[in-house]
């Protein structure tokens, strides 16, 4: 609204999780009312869903309008909310949109404790800590798609993990991914991916320089650029200088510098 206290969201009808189940406002309602507002799962309600992005702010209120429309209301203007929703803490959609059909089987409000106990025992979780079982199953962060414990968690990403072994992760194409190209072809194009977890940057660079990888990620070092150019000239690799949100350097401004001109 004009006061930046109400934000209405319109979801995409027909959108599906990677297991084929529809994405609806029930996933939002479950995420807000049964997860974020559950004090055992979240002893402290997340700051970015409080007024003014403050720990002292009032938690938002959710209104479900229909299967694909919902509204979040704050008691004070919160104009930066969309920006925080987009970039804050690399959370992505994971705390506002959860696959309710999957996670309800680990939630005490939907599954009796006696059914949860065998799962808790398998994870060495105390009998009075069902919420720790839930937290091992839910995703709260973008990076957790790489967590083998959460491999069965439905996602909205173009690929999902199918196996892992000794630092090698295998991924398959999400057949329900919501994007298409300009010709209407379903994305992504690539059916399978393999990711190798390499702890040493030097090892990564040596393997990348021989063309062993299709993509070494953002761990590639600019210090090695001259050597990489030589390998590119030899036809072993291709270098693309991507325009990214992350850079190998940063500039921090000192707002309290004593010289008023510089300040």
Can you describe what each PLM-predicted range is?
Residues 2-44, 50, 54-64, 73, ...:
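Extracytoplasmic/periplasmic ligand-capture domains
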Residues 10, 48-137:
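Surface-exposed binding/hinge segments that line
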Residues 140-142, 148:
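Secretory-pathway ectodomains
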